[in-house]
Amino acid sequence: MIRTGIFGGSFNPIHNGHISLARQLREKTGLDEVWLMVSPQNPLKKSSDLLDDNLRMEMARLAVEGREGIIASDYEMHLPKPSYTWNTLQSLSKDYPEREFVLLMGGDNWALFDKWYHYDDILKNYCIVVYPRRDSIRSFGETLSAQIVEAELLDISSTEIRERIKAGKGIRRMVPKAVADFIKEKGLYAKEA
């Protein structure tokens, strides 16, 4: 079986912190690949400032180009909405029977995990790797399916990047060069819609 980590997110935009985390989780957990699953929407978040799916997907592709074992995936964009992790994992398992899918999530999502659609089925059927995020540490409890992995988190957020762009400030150290160039070329995030 090919062990494949699923790292879902809006990636609005993708940044160096996402790439660093994917690399660390792959190395620390022995995953063969990490798929950055660009999500069309998060059922628990409002998506009013969410950039077009294709633009976010293109930035993800640019960000992972040449990075071994890290793949940008638009798989979830082709599934019925809203986008629920349980549905995505079930569909992936059916379409890729040679792969063992492992769900990667931050401590902030783990803290709300019992609110997720079919969370109990996810726990029963899939391994989960949780990385603590700042201000999100809670008692994780002991489950057979969750593995806590310490990772060095870069102090970067997509929200901060969007705000810096709107303010006319640079982002080159926050995102891969190809992503910064793409954002600039397309004029993304520069003005309020």
Please report, for each region that a protein language model flagged, where it lies by residue:
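Nucleotidyltransferase catalytic core that binds NTPs
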Residues: 1-193
